[in-house]
Amino acid sequence: MDAAAGRRTERRLAQTRHALAGLQAGMTGAFAMILWSALASAWNRRSFWIIPNLYATAFYGSRVYVNQFMRGSWSGLATMVVICGVAGMFWGLIWRDQARPFMGLMGAVCGLMFYYFLFDFVLRYASPLIPLYAPERQMQIGYVLWGIAVARSPFYSRRIAQAFQGQTAGDGQIATGAEIRSGEVIL
């Protein structure tokens, strides 16, 4: 019975590791998407805040959809990060440690599929202003960038596993997870 409990605990820890790796990759992709939105908005001579304000309409209604920074702009940015982070967690749980050839391409296709699922099914009913006013090509490219970033989740998962399995340090000592400082980025 102890062996079965140990396997369940090990499986649960592995799932947590994969979910955290997916969360890291999803949030990295969200920040890439936000950066792309900022560059594309500047190219189109619009404010950086137009896309975050559009996402903020889910909470504050149409009054926050303006071409400038508002108090609700932060909630729009947070919404983008949370949506992409949670989707990245699902990606991490599905792909686990399995890095395959053309993973970036699969991530880009998955990002585009996630865009269509989100904008055609979820947001159409949850917050209809977002799919109505979002710049389509700009958002599609943003979600493709998100997909490419989220495809790195198996790499992050393996790095987390290596950090906590006890790797040998350069001077012959056994390194444990204790050497990882709080807030350290695992690349």
Describe the predicted segments one by one.
Residues 161-187:
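Short, highly charged, low-complexity non-transmembrane loops/tails of multi-pass membrane proteins
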Residues 43-69:
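Membrane-interface interhelical connector segments
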Residues 74-92:
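Hydrophobic alpha-helical transmembrane segments
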Residues 30-34, 110-121:
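Aromatic-anchored segments of alpha-helical transmembrane domains
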Residues 128-141:
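Non-cytosolic membrane-interface motifs at loop->transmembrane helix junctions
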Residues 95-115:
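Internal alpha-helical transmembrane segments of multi-pass membrane proteins
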Residues 13-46:
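N-terminal signal-anchor transmembrane alpha helix
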Residues 86, 142-156:
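Hydrophobic cores of alpha-helical transmembrane segments in multi-pass inner/ER membrane proteins
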